[in-house]
């Protein structure tokens, strides 16, 4: 939920009333942190097919030796197809065939090959027709005000990102709906134009400030010219600012320095951010090669600033690497998590705390990840940070430990997190928790109390209608209120929500493990995907540290094995109780509906 997107304000800025919910959803999903942290929840059918084919081929080629990722991706794709309304309405026969095939266990090489062939022909049929069908479905949902808008918009944005759009660029696109002629043409014109867009040509300029390493008795200037020739052989020309102004008509001269030399990278992209990303990838390949052969000193992406110029419709934008590869803060030094971690790590009498070295090692790798601008380094170091904390002698392998512990840990306070997020959404929409019989300080430092009091409002038959009325100021906030009301009053809705989250996280960890292996063993990187996948790992690590330190403090133990066992058993107790036929579910879930935290043991 973004600040400044309440209904009244948007209508005043020119947005049509029937476009309010769509615009609010679009802006939330394309907010960088929201997308980078939660994108794994909106994987689309075409992406899922590609991933499963990739996993199968990797296994058949001998690059992987277990069925972990194949089984996880098969289950995920099966779930995607079951709930995809586009497949139901437009491609029922393809849907039926896939449901039948994906429901079978892949217990032989021949079945793997058969499924691969089937997925490939299905992809070829969907590739040319799915996007148009999805767009029509989304337009219909917007026009009728259907509840499916959120899921369909998430699928649509996921498809745009798969094509190569950056979410920052997508976010800005929606603002055109406030202006003519896009306002009059409506969302159908806006959406079809975006999904059918063609890549444009960009020239990207990076200052030539490399430190050369002179050889063979050559002067520094002579060897600098040699490096320029090497760059040229890779298709990267070096030009001065004045030379660039000569062939780039319309470029903003203020962005260039006349005598400064620039490395010029030509690329095709949908927007300036993806153009910057692809140019950095291209530069990295060349500069890493030159650095390896000591033609230049080691370099860092963080040292690079870029001037991105659209050569087809003259537009100039200056960017730094941090504008493209940004990370976010998930925990801060004022939190209870920090206080608990400090007590464990502090040298004042706690040097022997069993958890101390585990946390320090994990923090060290997390810092290495944050400090790096190279995607491979960022990803691998944050993965190692999770591995170092999850490693346990109670599991056969490290990935078994991660796949068991992390989903369980992320579910223990999942409801708590949903409530916290709802309160923050209300705050961004200028909703105050002032009711007829009580008031809640939404900025109180005690977040546990804030969550408890907010849940109590939802479950109070007098206050709950007052809260709903306050949330009507923003269409998306009101929709979120309705979702939270169901979660906090209906036992089965809560159970389904938590279990779906657990399953989704487990599927995604398998995906992240595959990416980790490809970087480690094959040097393969999924480029744009790796940017957001790194954010998922930061989020997982922050939650894991929070749970480990919380259980250590609450149970006065430093034994990692005991803490892991407590985390796993708490989730499994919830799982078992939710399935017990004789269980009074409202009674069992009473504590969870009070604090938002699973604390059964």
Put a short name on every predicted segment:
Residues 2-68, 335-601:
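Amphipathic, oligomerization/interface secondary-structure segments
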Residues 104-380, 384, 388, 531-600:
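Charged, non-catalytic interaction/linker regions at domain boundaries
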